A protein has these predicted regions:
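An N-terminal-biased, well-structured beta-alpha scaffold segment characteristic
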Residues: 1-78, 211-213, 217, 223, ...
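Hydrophobic Val/Ile/Leu positions in short beta-strands of Rossmann-like dinucleotide-binding domains
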Residues: 4-6, 140, 321
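Rossmann-like adenosine-cofactor binding region
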Residues: 39-44, 166-259, 274
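Oxidoreductase and adenylate-handling cofactor-binding alpha/beta cores
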Residues: 87-106, 152-159, 285-298, 334-338
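N-terminal Rossmann-fold NAD(P) dinucleotide-binding loop
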Residues: 147-148
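NAD(P)-dependent dehydrogenase/reductase Rossmann-like domain
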Residues: 250, 260-263, 271-387
Length: 387
């Protein structure tokens, strides 16, 4: 029996995928796996029983990745599950920034008691006129699941699309429209594009990547959209530029005292993935990742360990071992198994940065004695008898 804990409400359509071999517990200290959305985990005490954390969403800034890795806890996310919901809101942001829709709505509310509002509106509507997005240049920074959807949809809406991502995956490249112009220098996007939308993860290398220097390169009519992470933009520099009329609008999905109410800022309360479909998709993917790891030892969509999969186990036993990515590990655990008289029927070893993971299928049942001997190898973080 596996036990799981939900640190946030998780859509029932996902939780319903757990079989009868899983039990929901209210205490994280009793859990083998945890599902989380936005709950902060950095200060939580992580129990030794915890094997996996699945983030029902893409961002993992609320999860202590290094701490989890050191304790042999695999952290998963659900890339692409909420991509369409975010994509749609990006285009809503473009339209709100291009045409004063909000101003027009506010005007109607302020004049709701005017019996002649229809006639008055015809005279006032020029105050809320804007521009169309068709024919404009859109720069997409980051061509992951969301960025690719935004770029492709913009092509169909008649925009001239420029894409920048030096680390684009093979899958994303295959899915990207051939009409998207590939840019090798992000500064070209800053200088040339009417709309700039950011879709990169928050890393040390991307923190405040849109800074005062980048903003200074932009057109005075530029509109910047941020539906990724607020810390990707130096928002104090952005607000100063907006106040000075150096760019037109900043659209953000991350409200804070700096941007809310500031001139030229359109801010929404983190609505990007707040659709029933996105929440369902994230929950479904998160539960499937947990089940595949708990039942088969397979890692798919981990952010702190390498992806590693051998399908379902068809031999007498399977061992999963998380360890440091150092030389000599393969020979040590191969020798340990050989000394125990166990034949390796199949094995896959993958590494990612400082950490690695190995799945080993064996032709005889896995004993606790063998598990203990593997745990005693220097550099091993966690060993698990999968079958």
């Amino acid at each position: 029996m596996f036990k799981y804990n939900c640190l946030n409400p998780i859509a029932s359509v996902g939780l319903d995928l757990f079989s009868g071999d899983y039990e929901k517990v209210e205490d994280l200290g009793q859990a083998d796996a945890a599902l989380v959305r936005s709950a902060a985990m950095h200060e939580l005490e992580l129990p030794d029983s915890l094997l996996a954390v699945a983030r029902a969403g893409a961002g993992v800034n609320n999860i202590p990745l290094d701490k989890c890795a050191e304790k042999g806890i695999v952290v998963f996310n659900t890339p692409g599950a909420n991509a369409n919901g975010v994509k749609e809101l990006v285009f809503a942001g473009m339209l709100y920034a291009s045409r004063d829709i909000v101003g027009g709505i506010d005007w109607c509310l302020a004049n709701q008691n005017d019996e002649n509002i229809a006639k008055t509106a015809e005279k006032q509507k020029k105050n809320f006129a804007g521009t169309e997005i068709s024919g404009k240049k859109l720069g997409v920074i980051g061509l992951g699941a969301i960025g690719v959807l935004v770029a492709n949809a913009a092509i169909h809406m008649g925009m001239d699309v420029y894409g920048y991502d030096p680390y684009i995956s093979v899958s994303a490249a295959w899915n990207l429209s051939r009409s998207v112009k590939h840019i090798s220098n992000v500064e070209d996007i800053y200088r040339e594009c009417d709309y700039i939308t950011i879709h990169v993860p928050l890393l040390d290398s991307t923190r405040k990547m849109v800074n005062a220097e980048a903003i200074a390169m932009m057109k005075p009519n530029a509109i910047v959209l941020n539906f990724a992470r607020d810390l990707l933009v130096d928002e104090e520099a952005m607000v100063e530029a907006l106040a000075a009329g150096k760019i037109k609008k900043y659209v953000s999905d991350f409200p804070n005292p700096t941007t809310v109410g500031a001139k030229g800022c359109i801010v929404t309360p983190h609505l990007g993935a707040s659709t029933a479909e996105s929440e369902d998709n994230c929950a479904i993917m998160a539960v499937r990742e947990i089940r595949d790891y708990m039942e088969n030892g397979n890692i798919v969509h981990s952010v702190n360990f390498p992806d590693c999969s051998m399908g379902a186990c068809t031999t007498a036993g399977r061992i999963g071992m998380l360890h440091r990515n150092v030389s000599g590990m393969i020979s040590q655990y191969s020798t340990t198994l050989g000394d125990a008289g166990m034949n390796i029927a199949g094995m896959t070893n993958k590494s990612k940065g400082d950490y690695a993971y190995v799945l080993i299928d064996v032709d005889s049942p896995v004993t606790e004695e063998v598990i203990q001997k593997l745990e005693n190898i220097e550099g091993v973080l966690k060993v698990r008898k999968v079958k």
